[in-house]
A protein has these predicted regions:
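Interhelical loop/hinge segments that connect adjacent transmembrane helices in multipass membrane
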Residues: 2-24, 203, 215-257
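Signature of the first transmembrane helix
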Residues: 18-79, 83, 248-268
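Helix-terminus/linker motif at the lipid-water interface of multi-pass membrane proteins
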Residues: 32, 36-54, 124-131, 187-194, ...
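Small-residue-rich hydrophobic transmembrane alpha-helices
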Residues: 54-114, 151-170, 278-342, 346
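Short runs within selected transmembrane alpha-helices of multi-pass transporters and secretion channels
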Residues: 75, 144-162, 170-178, 199-214, ...
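Short membrane-interface helical motifs at transmembrane helix boundaries
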Residues: 111-138, 142, 333-356
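Alpha-helical transmembrane segments of multi-pass membrane proteins
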Residues: 131-154, 287, 293, 354-358
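Membrane-interface helix-loop junctions in multi-pass transport and translocation proteins
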Residues: 178-212, 342-344, 348
Length: 358
């Protein structure tokens, strides 16, 4: 119990700069693995199937990102409430918040998955997906919607771990899931010749196992926190409403950006599969580039919530200054790297001729 408390409350006792950067580092690695996890589908189909296969996965990517944004935004919002209870030492309330979060997002993800399955083809039609890649794009997206609860539960549980001051467990799970996804991608595509279906099924299996392991580890971790005088509840409606108020701005922030990208993707789709493939490769590189900024922002969110819960407003201001300069430094470095080595990065997804077009 002592070890659990130490790790959980490091955000309250360590120097703000040290606490934030040490907490953010596993988040950066974890987010990189998350992007690597997603990118492998594109790399495998682009290199071992065809340009059209890459285009079909890329055309679906903008849609999947909207749902990922909802999961991440919701998890970030809920983690604020969890961190506040943890910072205030109200551990039973913290457990109730975790349980309420998991139940809420399991129901939401199932509903969104059902919606996606019902309107799968209609969504792609509205996005102007070309006929020559429509069938594969619809297949990839359909399998993705079946696995939506797995994706939601992993991302939300990762946010819960972060809110508890544990950014290492999500990283370990992502490494496991990413490696499994790569092996299954190559197995299903190269050995079983399943093409687009293969990478979609591989992703579903890897996400499912990752979500299940995450749940088991989280339950074990929560048992390490002592019970206090407050009553535990599996689901608290008032707390769910409070979480919704906090999470909604985060969900909207994440989703509006992705909806904008979705509209751009709809325009790109009118130019044919070659342009879609090039654009898909470019957006994957962009996703990697913004990882450090997102991770530091998430670290600051957890840092702020825990310290506000404990009444340490001065530490929050100090942490903000550290984040500001760290983000500015990352932005300059990443801008230079993408400008200098953009063509090299694109070649990871496409052959030489297609890379030149991209």
């Amino acid at each position: 119990m002592e070890n659990v408390s130490k790790k959980s409350f490091s955000m309250l006792t360590d120097r703000p700069g040290k606490a934030l950067l040490l907490f953010a580092f596993p988040l950066i690695l974890g987010n990189l693995f998350q992007q690597f996890y997603n990118i492998m589908d594109s790399v495998v189909v682009g290199k071992f199937v065809s340009e059209n296969a890459l285009a079909s996965v890329g055309a679906s990517y903008a849609v999947t990102n909207v749902f990922i944004a909802v999961a991440i935004g919701g998890g970030m919002g809920s983690s604020v409430i969890i961190s506040q209870f943890l910072g205030a030492g109200r551990l039973t309330k913290m457990k109730t918040a975790v349980s309420t979060t998991l139940i809420s997002f399991l129901v939401i993800s199932a509903a969104l998955g059902a919606f996606g399955l019902a309107f799968n083809d209609r969504i792609l039609s509205l996005m102007n997906v070309p006929d020559n890649i429509f069938a594969d794009a619809a297949l990839y997206l359909r399998i993705y919607f079946w696995g939506l609860p797995f994706l939601f539960m992993y991302n939300v549980q990762a946010s819960v771990f972060n809110s508890l001051g544990d950014s290492r467990t999500p990283l370990k799970l992502l490494i496991f899931s990413s490696l499994l996804n790569i092996v299954l991608d190559l197995l299903f595509v190269i050995e079983f010749h399943m093409a687009v279906r293969g990478v979609a099924v591989a992703t579903l299996i890897a996400q499912g196992l990752s979500a299940a392991l995450s749940f088991l580890i989280l339950m074990r971790k929560l048992r390490g926190y002592r019970q206090d005088e407050e009553d535990f509840r599996f689901y608290d409606r008032e707390m769910a409403a409070s979480m919704t108020r906090v999470a909604l701005p985060s969900i909207l922030q994440q989703s509006i950006v992705q909806l904008g990208i979705l509209l751009v993707q709809s325009v790109v789709n009118t130019f044919g599969s070659s342009v879609i493939a090039g654009y898909s490769a470019g957006t994957r590189i962009e996703s990697i580039s913004i990882v450090p900024m997102l991770a530091i922002g998430n670290a600051m969110s957890t840092f702020t919530a825990q310290n506000m819960g404990a009444g340490n407003q001065k530490r929050v201001k100090e942490g903000y200054r550290v984040c500001y300069f760290a983000l500015a430094g990352f932005a300059v470095v990443l801008c230079v790297l993408t400008q200098l080595f953009g063509s090299l990065f694109i070649s990871a997804f496409l052959d030489a001729e297609a890379s030149a077009e991209a």
